Amino acid sequence: EPDSVELSTVGGWVATNASGMKKNRYGNIEDIVENINLVSPKGVVKQIKPISRGSIGFKPQNILFGSEGNIGIITKVILKIHEIPNSQKYNSVIFKDWNDGIGFMKELSKTNYIPASVRLVDNIQFRFGQALKPRPEGFKKYKSKIEKFFVTKVKGFDPDKMCAVTVVMEGTSSEVNYQEKNITKLAKKHRGVIGGSGNGKRGYMLTYAIAYVRDFAARYQIMGETMETTVPWSKIQDVIDATTKKLEILHQENNLPGKPYISYRIPQIYHTGVCIYFMLGISVKGVSDPEEKFSKIEHSMRKV
């Protein structure tokens, strides 16, 4: 279930070696593909039968993952299917700062109760998501004020530093309950405050809406892009700091208006590291050759 599910294809997932938000439970694209057909300039490549595992040689289909059209066009893919889970629950946790969130994610990655999906968003993305929430009315308005008072005044969280984790748990009722109980316990250990299922679900809905937010921003001459990389746990902050600094330098060098936007989240956790997903935006109002300048900035950012 990749973030781009509405705007992408199965062949595209294979060609880009894609991952999805629920890879913890169902695997990445390479884990769920059984057969692939590919059309190349030399003819059609067909995999005769599924190969679950072989101890001799390698799986030829592995060459096609991440090939990005260089070998040919993927025309057919047979995927494994899973039963729809009996139970699904969303949840969310608010942490005092980014480091607390990282500590929670790292310890969670070593447990036996990793949920189908778990994401850590930085303060900027957290506030962005809050800004896009529908304005509460009636009882919900008072409930929202009480929640805000509790988090900021009672718990002492700084609105400009707090970050959030969103969670999706799937499986049998007993599996989901086990995950929820232990995730709650671990969150409290790292000074987290449970934010509830509504905030958790809304966090994932923002993921699907981001392409439309990009199109909306384009009307106001703001260009945006996303990029991701996988790094060891020990290098997370180094990569974030280097990327943020590089964007600021490039923004100044190109004499662009306003301030650059950059935010990040950790959508995937692994035993030895994480995937960091960056979102960036730049105003190009009044800029000559904006596409060319933005393309150069993007390539420079990817090198970091």
Regions found by a protein language model. Name each.
Residues 1-121:
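FAD-binding subdomain of flavoenzyme oxidoreductases
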Residues 106-300:
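C-terminal substrate-recognition/cap domain of FAD-linked oxidoreductases
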Residues 70-77, 148-153, 301-304:
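Structured alpha-helical segments in the cores of large, soluble enzyme domains
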Residues 35, 300-301:
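Generic recognition of well-ordered alpha-helical segments
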